[in-house]
């Protein structure tokens, strides 16, 4: 998980790595590009985990979450304030962006199985 920078909307809240899909890109291609731009890593994109939509007062965002593995590199803080590797049981220790809450709920449900 990554902590948003102080100078952006939803400052210092935690989120999953990602960003906008550019014209002509698939969602997996966008994720590969965003991981390279935000963390300087190359990932292999696996199965889609879930999709969700959330409306903030200023923007509506559509999130698609994929499982990924790092193929190359060590994550670096290029755009975020902080970075953490956590287990599902630690999710509640962090303040996430509201848009991520349905994803967190699903992760915790999956972890109970």
Question: Predicted regions span which residues?
Answer:
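N-terminal strand-loop-strand
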Residues: 1-15
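Short, charged/polar surface micro-motifs in flexible loops or helix N-caps
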Residues: 6-9, 22-23, 69-73
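The catalytic Nudix box helix
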Residues: 16-48, 87
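Surface-exposed, flexible loop/turn segments at secondary-structure boundaries
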Residues: 7, 54, 91
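Active-site-adjacent beta-strand/loop module that shapes the phosphate/pyrophosphate-binding cleft
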Residues: 42, 51-74, 84, 107
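NUDIX/MutT-family hydrolases
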Residues: 67, 76-107
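Generic C-terminal helix-cap and adjacent flexible tail
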Residues: 108-113
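A structural microfeature
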Residues: 1, 47-50
């Amino acid at each position: 998980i990554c902590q948003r920078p102080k100078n952006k909307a939803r400052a210092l809240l935690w989120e999953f790595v990602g960003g906008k899909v550019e014209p002509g890109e698939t969602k997996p291609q966008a994720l590969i590009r965003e991981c390279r731009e935000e963390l300087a890593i190359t990932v292999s994109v696996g199965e889609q985990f879930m999709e969700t939509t959330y409306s903030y007062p200023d923007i509506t965002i559509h999130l698609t979450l994929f499982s990924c593995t790092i193929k190359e590199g060590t994550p670096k803080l290029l755009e975020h304030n902080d970075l953490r590797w956590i287990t599902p049981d630690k999710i509640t220790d962090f303040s996430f962006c509201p848009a991520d809450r349905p994803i967190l709920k699903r992760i915790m449900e999956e972890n109970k199985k």
